[in-house]
């Protein structure tokens, strides 16, 4: 009896580890795709916002969801369109980004309050949360790294922090300590040159 109980906990641990690794690998691959195809990603996010808007309008017309919840959801989608204007460069300190984060919290509060008072099956509640609350912020979250398009191979020689600090803009003059640091940098981290 105890042996089977121990095996069940061990198998649960292994399954959770595999699921976590699979989700991490999927997110990494998705982030790579978003970074590679930013224009297509922007278009997909725009269509997702339109779809979420249509779902919110449908919930208001057909299901009689509260006006406040639908209104805040539609306003949040407008803020998402504002974020999309500068995509893939999203400033975490911009008022638009901060407002969208605040509206996500407000939307969750209104949805939890509504679904606590009104009974809906779990699958319908999950559908609302997925299409109206989670999918667009998740898309923006995964694409946050797409604006960081500075790759190590695009760096110009001598543009590293050490070189800029010691030369202070004087490229022609090389001081003794700079030569030592350049030698150490090339010895430890050799730059990769493309050979054709």
UniProtKB/Swiss-Prot annotation:
| Localisation per UniProt entry | Membrane
- Sequence intervals crossing the membrane: 3-23, 42-62, 70-90, 97-117, 125-145
**Official protein name in the record:** Protein TEX261
- One Pfam entry for this protein is Erv26
What InterPro entries does UniProt report for this protein, alphabetically? Svp26/Tex261
What is the protein's membrane topology class? Multi-pass membrane protein
One GO MF annotation is: COPII receptor activity
User: One GO cellular component from the entry?
Assistant: COPII-coated ER to Golgi transport vesicle
The UniProt keyword set, sorted, is:
Membrane, Transmembrane, Transmembrane helix
| Record bears the keyword Membrane | yes
Organism field: Pongo abelii
Any GO BP annotation? endoplasmic reticulum to Golgi vesicle-mediated transport
Q: Which family does it belong to?
A: Belongs to the SVP26 family.
